[in-house]
Amino acid sequence: MNRFLRGACAALLAVGVISTMSCSSDTRKVAEVGGEGVELQEYRYYFLNNKRELYGDDAELDDASVAELKKMCGENVKNRHALSLLAKEYGAKLSEDDDAKLDELVEALKSNYADDDAYKAALTADFLTEELYRELSGDMLLAENVIARMKEKGELPADDDTTSVDAALRSDDMACVKEIYVYYPSDETREIALNRANEAYSRLMSGESFEDLMREYSSYSAEQVPYDAGYYTMRYDALDEVWAEVEKLSPGEHSGVFESTYGFHIVLRCEKDADYMAEHREELYDIYSHSKFYERFYALYDTLTVTMTGYGDKLDFRGLSMGEK
C-alpha cells in the first residue's frame, strides 16, 4: 500500500510542523508537469527531504547524487500533479468545508509551539512553508473529492446502492487472501527469514494446513489479519508483488515463496464469504473505491513527464537550501 493517499500524504502529516515564512522566490517555477508549474517551494521540499533520507543534511553532493535526487523529485511532483490534473478532469475542487478543515489543521499545529518564533523555527527543520503545508494537506481532501465525483458520474456505485456495491465486491477485481508472511528487518536476517519461509512451504506441500502454518510462521498477529477470514484486497491496495501472485491464482490455489520489499510471502487465494463481505461492506467498499481511484490516477501518471524550466536549470542543486532565491 505504497500509494499516493497513504504514502506521500501520510508522510507529510508525520512531519507535524509548518511555517508562516515565505518569500517571493518560493513561487518561481522550477519545472512543468502536464502543463502545470512546479514551484520552488514544492520542488525544494522533496529535494531536501530526499537528500536527508539518502545522504544526510550535511552531505556534499556530486553530479550522480544530484541526478538521483532530481529523478526522485520527478516522481514526487508527478504524484502531486497527477492528482491535480485528475481533479480538473473530474471537476473536483476543495469545498468551503475543506478550507475550514485546513484552517483548523494549521491552527492546531500552531498551538504546539510556545511562541511564533518557535513556530517559524520549524521551517528549516522540515523544509516547509505554511502555504505548501496547506497544499499538501489539501491533497488528501482533494483525492476524496475525486472519488466522490467518480461516484456521481456512475464510474463507481453510490455508497447507498448496496446491490451495485455488493456486485463490485464480488467481482474478480477483489480477492480474499490468506498469507504466510515472514518479515526480515535487515539484510543480516534475510537468510534466516528465507529459510523459515521455505520450511513453511515444505510443510504446506506435505499436506499441513495453510491456516496452521499461518499461525506458526507469519509475522502478522491475529489482530492485524483475521486468520480465519483472511483479508480482502485489490490491485493498488495490496503490495505490488503480492497482487502479481494473487491474480495468477484461482480460489483454493496457493503460490510458492516469493519476496517483496517487506519480506517473504506465500499466498492462498480463497473463496469469498458473502456474510463476511456484507458485515464489512463499508470497509471493503472503501478499499474498492480507492483502488479504482488509483487505477485512474496511475493511468494519468504514466503519461506525464517533468520538464525543468530555464530557472530550474540554473539552480545550484548541490547547495539548495531553504534560503535559496
Feature-to-residue mapping (PLM):
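N-terminal targeting/tethering segments
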Residues: 24-131
